[in-house]
């Protein structure tokens, strides 16, 4: 994959998603990935900030962009237990304290769902966009209706992740 990306005639990003260990971030950066995501979303705020700052320290000198998550996008097998919407003030503080390049936020999507039966919080995304000036990312977007994907973009999302139906 990395070699294909290097040979590509169009700009290509090779991204490590949802790494929870800094060793995985180091390995991806050393291997030539151009983007990594450190996922400390299940950690308390201060611990998430701390681990994310280290990921930025590892990646930034090598020109690798770093994404992180604040709030928690749940999984279809246990969506309510681990889902926590992103607080705009917390997102603003997190972005300022960590220096990440992109921020994944939780506004109602759920990982691994082929059809989404949840209410997306478009107003929440707008409020986050007002205070966070880096690119916002939406995870767990498989099954979101096209019209809602467009609304997410209109409300400030610049990257939308989906993979469940591609597996």
Task: Give the positions of each predicted feature.
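Alpha/beta enzyme core
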Residues: 1-11, 18-134, 146-157, 162
């Amino acid at each position: 994959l990395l070699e294909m990306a290097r040979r590509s005639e169009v700009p290509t990003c090779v991204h490590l998603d949802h790494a929870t260990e800094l060793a995985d971030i180091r390995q991806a950066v050393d291997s030539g990935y151009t983007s990594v995501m450190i996922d400390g979303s299940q950690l308390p705020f201060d611990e998430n900030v701390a681990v994310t700052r280290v990921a930025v320290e590892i990646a930034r000198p090598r020109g690798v962009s770093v994404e992180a998550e604040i709030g928690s996008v749940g999984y279809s097998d246990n969506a309510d237990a681990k889902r926590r919407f992103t607080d705009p003030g917390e997102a603003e503080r997190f972005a300022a304290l960590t220096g990440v390049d992109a921020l994944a936020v939780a506004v109602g999507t759920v990982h691994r769902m082929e059809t989404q039966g949840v209410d997306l919080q478009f107003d929440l995304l707008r409020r986050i966009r007002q205070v966070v000036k880096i690119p916002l990312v939406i995870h767990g977007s498989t099954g979101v209706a096209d019209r809602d994907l467009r609304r997410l973009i209109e409300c400030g999302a610049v990257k939308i992740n989906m993979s469940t139906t591609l597996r």
